[in-house]
Amino acid sequence: MVNILKKLANGVSLNIDEAYLLSREILSGGLNDVAVAAALTAMRCRGETAEEVTGFVKSAREVAVKVPLRVEAIDTAGTGGDGAGTINLSTLAAVVAAAAGARVLKHGNRSASGFFGSADFMEAVGYNLEVGPEKAAEMVEKIGFAFVFAPRYHPAFAKVAPVRRQLPFRTVFNIVGPLANPGLVKRQLIGVSERRLLDVVGGVASVLLDRALVVYGSGVDEVSTEGPTEVVEVRGGRAERYVLEPEDFGIGKTPLPRASTREEAVGLALAGLRGEHREAEIAIAVNAAAALYVAEVVRDFRDGFELAVKTIREGAAYRKLREAVEASR
């Protein structure tokens, strides 16, 4: 471990195995806080590599409480931290995708920068955040959707929480979280809040996932309706980079819905899910389209958008949310 820490201090990046060993030591409580802070700071200052994040994700998955999925499912998650104040589109898109035929094990936490993170929203609508692994697996199988609260499934992260709170910047664990789904899903829509993370997370996805879309939407960790979204698409270990425009979904540029209070955020989210707020509905449908594409429910983004809008306007999306809330209790 001393040699690994020295490599980091000298600005040298770690390979997957070294990063795995470092993460395992951190998550087991084997490193003191000073060493943990030094390692996380060195990685952040240099910029975390795909190999390092892959090693950390492997370790996090290994020690997680597992959801014993019996069917194939997807996840929609973002790194958060974009500070854009948008409603929680990844969660809403997951609900719409589930209502439209995908199976989704949504993994999330409380807010990183906005008013409502995934867990904040699900809790606000009455979902039981303490849903256990067997229950979550059953929900995905029977109703196509379950939300799993990250701290419930990653108790080892509590060991590094005090250090993370003391550091004035985001660390590798903010990148690891969205990739550490406890159901070990093989398909994901992943939003990143920094352009540099497109290739980093894309590299991790190439190793650990069968299919993924990694998206950076002009400053937000979602597919943007306001302008271009940079994408790394991973399929069978190969990565392709391209740009999505709103026109690829059959729409023009549309403002992303933003909120200034928690109450406004949840109100906008529910209005969008019911088709009662145009900007929110479009933003949710665009991100649901990307999720449906990853799940291979649709062949392209335009078809995905049309299916998502239809699902919202027929009331199926809101009914799916209420069904999940009831099933969680």
UniProtKB/Swiss-Prot annotation:
Organism: Pyrobaculum islandicum (strain DSM 4184 / JCM 9189 / GEO3)
Binding site for anthranilate 1: 78, 109
Originating gene: trpD
Keyword Transcription regulation: no
GO terms for MF: anthranilate phosphoribosyltransferase activity; magnesium ion binding
GO cellular component: cytosol
Binding-site residues for Mg(2+) 2, renumbered to this chain: 221-222
Cofactor(s) listed: Mg(2+)
Family: Belongs to the anthranilate phosphoribosyltransferase family.
Binding site for Mg(2+) 1: 90, 222
Biological process per Gene Ontology, one example term: L-tryptophan biosynthetic process
Residue sites binding anthranilate 2 per the record: 164
Pathway: Amino-acid biosynthesis; L-tryptophan biosynthesis; L-tryptophan from chorismate: step 2/5
Pfam families, A to Z: Glycos_trans_3N, Glycos_transf_3
Chain sites annotated for binding 5-phospho-alpha-D-ribose 1-diphosphate: 78, 81-82, 86, 88-91, 106-114, 118
Subunit structure: Homodimer.
Substrates-to-products reaction catalysed: N-(5-phospho-beta-D-ribosyl)anthranilate + diphosphate = 5-phospho-alpha-D-ribose 1-diphosphate + anthranilate
Keyword tags: Amino-acid biosynthesis, Aromatic amino acid biosynthesis, Glycosyltransferase, Magnesium, Metal-binding, Transferase, Tryptophan biosynthesis
Co-factor note (free text): Binds 2 magnesium ions per monomer.
Keyword Nucleotide-binding belongs to the record: no
First-tier enzyme category under EC: transferase
PANTHER family: ANTHRANILATE PHOSPHORIBOSYLTRANSFERASE
EC numbers, comma separated: 2.4.2.18
Protein name, as recorded: Anthranilate phosphoribosyltransferase
